[in-house]
């Protein structure tokens, strides 16, 4: 808000801005990053994960709590998430909310946060490994 005037932006504007700051990974590159030590974080809801499966070795952190889990000052942080130098690859269903979330993690100081272009849908379409969601 500048001078009391609200400048309206669309979600598409926010998404474009977020993605301009990310080096998004395709499915194969995301797998390679995971093998090299990147933390793959699945932000999808538990119901969707149960219905479609998960990326082996991924960590489930619902989008609704992701930023609190990643902020060491929040009182609700997850030790596995608060390494500001670690390569973090966020995964949502189709690669939209994960882009916005990755940009927010970058704003919090996670310089290597990015997302999976096309989300879990692209991972599955590429024929990469999927396993049942943990109970």
Placement of each model-derived feature along the sequence:
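Rhodanese-like catalytic fold shared by cysteine-dependent sulfurtransferases
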Residues: 1-39, 46-87, 94-135
């Amino acid at each position: 808000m500048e001078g009391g005037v609200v400048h309206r932006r669309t979600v598409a504007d926010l998404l474009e801005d977020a993605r301009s700051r990310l080096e998004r990974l395709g499915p194969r590159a995301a797998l390679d990053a995971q093998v090299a030590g990147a933390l793959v974080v699945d932000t999808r809801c538990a119901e969707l994960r149960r219905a479609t499966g998960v990326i082996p070795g991924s960590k489930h952190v619902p989008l609704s709590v992701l930023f609190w889990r990643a902020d060491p000052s929040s009182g609700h942080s997850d030790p596995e998430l608060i390494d500001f130098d670690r390569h973090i690859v966020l995964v949502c269903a189709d690669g939209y909310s994960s882009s916005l979330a990755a940009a927010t993690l970058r704003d919090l100081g996670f310089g290597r946060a990015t997302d999976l272009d096309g989300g879990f849908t692209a991972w599955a379409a590429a024929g990469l490994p999927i396993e049942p969601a943990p109970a």
